[in-house]
Amino acid sequence: MKISELMEVLNNHVPFHQAESWDNVGLLIGNDKLDITGILTTLDCTDDVVNQAIELNTNTIIAHHPLIFKGVKRIVEDGYGSIIRKLIQNNINLIALHTNLDVNPKGVNRMLADQIGLENISMINTNSSYYYKVQTFIPKNYIEDFKDSLNELGLAKEGNYEYCFFESEGKGQFKPVGDASPYIGKLDSIEYVDEIKLEFMIKGNELEITKRAILDNHPYETPVFDFIKMNKESEYGLGIIGQLNQTMTLDEFSEYAKKQLNIPSVRYTGQHDSPIKKVAIIGGSGIGFEYKASQLGADVFVTGDIKHHDALDAKIQNVNLLDINHYSEYVMKEGLKELLEKWLFKYENQFPIYASEINTDPFKYK
């Protein structure tokens, strides 16, 4: 399998367009024409992680946090530059799945929820998205070639299904006049053609490529086509809310979460004996959603990187917070490995997939 094929699989399951506009996801370093020798999943791409990839003869690293995020002004033999140089010198590809993995229904937040053992899970902040229903009219004899052209561009796909079209037959008519150069018919003569009305769905960001595909592949000089905008509730969204199988006190839950996530420390705001049954989680840095989680009935909001004033505000407003540190997202290493094994199972010439055991938490705890 080549990197380009892997990128297509990833885009099908963890769409890159679902990432936040400020994010930097996808193939950050590498060559999409290279064959994959192995994949190593990691939270952060550090020098130690790159060394591990070299030792494992693995030429592809998939990290949650982008190595190239802020503007890189120079690549020298220190800091991030040394990591980038080592990746390039050893022909190692670096792929980032960040906020697009955060909002995925099987992504980081679901992995954290599963680790804690939440049940009856739903999303905190479901996104709404738009798409288009496309309809155009094709002479019957050209319909299959036209559909093939659209499919080659990745259009008319729904999840794991290709060639998602609906056809209905009819009869079209036209009369070429003036300087017309008809593909079918003669000047100044009404032509009747057996046509197929072809309908299919596209994502919101596929409008321009679809328009160009129709104009380039339709046999008519001036094809008729419509784009009908439609809205739907997305299956993607940020954060998970679910229930514990039994009620605990806030103090008990903090110890339980620490143990389940295997992290060195936690801290919380709120009364130690507050009853906890319904739990909301946003991995990484999720402050800003704690009040929505509370409105949804969460007894505690679990996240990382909680600042003093945010914690104080929540405490004053009786919103319980549990800080599990940003590094708790490390659960994605094994979680993503399992997802990749499922997504790539049907492909031949398999390669090993590893979850890095290297701890990239920059903090030491006492």
From Swiss-Prot:
Q: Name one Pfam family in it.
A: DUF34_NIF3
**Which GO cellular component terms, listed alphabetically, does the Swiss-Prot or TrEMBL entry include?**
cytoplasm
InterPro entries for this protein: DUF34/NIF3, DUF34/NIF3_bac, DUF34/NIF3_sf, N-reg_PII/ATP_PRibTrfase_C
Q: Where does a divalent metal cation 2 bind?
A: 65, 326, 329
Citing just one GO molecular function, the answer is: metal ion binding
Q: Which residues bind a divalent metal cation 1?
A: 64, 102, 329
Q: Please give the Gene3D superfamilies that the UniProt record associates with this protein.
A: 3.30.70.120, NIF3 (NGG1p interacting factor 3)-like
* Keywords per UniProt: Metal-binding
Task: Identify its protein family.
Answer: Belongs to the GTP cyclohydrolase I type 2/NIF3 family.
Q: What does the subunit section of this Swiss-Prot or TrEMBL entry state?
A: Homohexamer.
**The protein's name:** GTP cyclohydrolase 1 type 2 homolog
Q: Please report the organism this UniProt entry assigns to the protein.
A: Staphylococcus epidermidis (strain ATCC 12228 / FDA PCI 1200)
